[in-house]
Regions:
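Hydrophobic faces of well-ordered beta-strands that scaffold small-molecule active sites
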Residues: 2-8, 30-32, 60-64, 96-100, ...
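Divalent metal-coordination and catalytic microenvironments
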Residues: 5, 26, 49, 98, ...
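Active-site beta-loop-alpha junctions enriched in small/polar residues
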Residues: 5-9, 35-37, 65-70, 101-104, ...
Length: 325
């Protein structure tokens, strides 16, 4: 199973520990956007997570974060990334594209920096991730899509999913710890008959408790089936559709000669119990238990102690005075 868009940092764990948590649930590929570490450590932080991901037994591709900082002038970020940084990162082996382009007003208005980041990604032949968090599906949305983003996961309504597909995007339907957008948007397939090949499943953000108690992409697929999708269609939306979107269908997304031997064994396509997990031909988990020996990643000193409060805190700093009377 593939997670087409997600942020490891939402789990409050490292890439290695996240992989350890999701492998028993059948996840063998992830497309991560390390936006949070980019806001703190800049390009070296992104490279750190990229290199950590490359050493793991499942496929983890990195989307180079865009819009760093995410709200210029409204926050004190630890770093700022520009077009040159994006262009440089596109040469790294495990970079699959540009992370979600959150500055949708800027793209629609022709902001030079945003369009430059998109152009650098497209020149490298990679995929531009979208983030259009607005109910306005008129000219502003059309201008945003024309700017280059190829997918979007911010839809919450059936009409959002329909609009994205009609404009040539892939609609990513997310079920995470705080996002419950599959049920409403999947109706574009089950009710309106849109081609399911233009839809992809993802999580976006999963807290550690969700991973432990509920699962990962297996949870999303089960939920999609419960909303009326045929099991094989829901599975396709978490495998082959994702691979094709990122131009990796010759490597993954299907069980066929020449592909990576990433697969799960299950006795029930609808209930989807994950009984065995293989990645690159190696058994990594069986009956919910991790079998692979995955060593912790040694984070360097520069990645530690990055919270700077400006002063030494005391208990009194957390006092809240009651108003008089």
């Amino acid at each position: 199973l593939c997670d087409a868009h997600m942020h490891v940092e939402s789990g409050m764990v490292t890439v290695t520990e996240f992989a350890r948590a999701v492998i028993p649930h059948g996840t063998t590929s992830m497309f991560i956007d390390p936006h949070e570490i980019a806001n703190v450590l800049g390009l070296p932080g992104v490279k750190l997570m990229h290199d950590e991901a490359m050493g793991l037994p499942i496929n983890i591709w990195v989307q180079m974060p865009s819009c760093v900082p995410s709200a210029p002038g409204l926050e004190h970020a630890g770093a700022e990334l520009g077009v040159e940084d994006v262009a440089a990162a596109m040469q790294w082996p495990n970079i699959c594209g540009l992370g979600e382009m959150m500055n949708f007003p800027g793209v629609a208005a022709g902001d030079a920096r945003m369009l430059g980041e998109i152009a650098a990604t497209q020149m490298a032949g990679k995929t531009v991730g979208g983030h259009y968090a607005s109910p306005d599906l008129g000219p502003a949305f059309h201008a945003y899509v024309a700017g280059g983003p190829a997918d979007d996961h911010e839809g919450t309504r059936k009409e959002d999913a329909i609009a994205r597909v009609r404009q040539g995007m892939r609609a990513m339907l997310r079920l995470g710890s705080a996002w419950y957008d599959v049920a409403t948007q999947v109706k574009a397939i089950t009710e309106d008959g849109l081609d399911s090949r233009n839809f992809i499943l993802c999580t976006d953000d999963s807290h550690s408790g969700t991973l432990v108690n509920d699962g990962h992409m297996n949870r999303v697929v089960r939920h999609a089936i419960a909303q009326g999708l045929k099991p094989i269609t829901a599975i396709q939306m978490a495998t082959l559709n994702t691979a094709q979107h990122f131009g990796m269908e010759r490597e993954l997304g299907s069980i066929a000669p020449g592909r990576r031997a990433d697969m799960i064994l299950t006795s029930d396509l609808a209930a989807l119990p994950v009984e065995l997990v293989m990645a690159r031909g190696e058994v990594l988990a069986e009956n919910g238990a991790l079998q692979a020996d995955i060593a912790p990643y040694p984070y360097p000193d520069f990645a530690r102690g990055t919270v700077h409060m400006g002063k030494q805190l005391s208990a009194g700093d957390f006092d809240v005075e009651a108003p008089a009377g």
